[in-house]
Design a protein with these regions (language model features):
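Conserved active-site "lid/cap" helical segment
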Residues: 62
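A short, sequence-level motif marking secondary-structure junctions
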Residues: 21-26
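Charged interaction scaffolds used for protein-protein
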Residues: 1-16, 27, 31-49, 53, ...
Length: 120
């Protein structure tokens, strides 16, 4: 699978999934938990760390934004155990990060190409 702009593709268990947060998923998260910017700060130790529930909800909402139905996303996340939480934490951090900065990876690739051209 290829990631949409503002999304990522990651593997959970033995399946590859597309994740993307759109405004509607962000608003759903904020209605249930806290502001997305508070969550963002928490990922980097500048605020309250995300709870396991928040991490799982970002994963599920990212799956919905990536094209999955709500019940399918909930089922995929429910298969994850406590041993998956650190990986889910990092995936949820990436989901939010790429939603905020959808072209960041493209800029890094362009910069590397430009630097390589200068060396040649």
């Amino acid at each position: 699978a290829e990631a949409q702009r503002g999304g990522i593709v990651e593997t959970i268990g033995d399946a590859s999934y597309s994740f993307r947060l759109r405004n509607r998923e962000i608003e759903r998260f904020e209605d249930k938990h806290r502001g997305i910017f508070d969550l963002w700060d928490g990922f980097f130790g500048r605020g309250t760390k995300p709870t396991s529930t928040e991490v799982r909800d970002i994963i599920a909402l990212g799956l919905v934004g990536g094209g999955m139905k709500d019940h399918e996303a909930d089922k995929a996340v429910s298969k994850c155990g406590p041993d998956d939480l650190m990986r889910l934490f990092h995936i949820s951090q990436a989901i939010v990060g790429v939603a905020f900065m959808p072209d960041a990876g493209d800029e890094d690739a362009k910069k590397k190409t430009a630097e390589a051209d200068l060396i040649d």
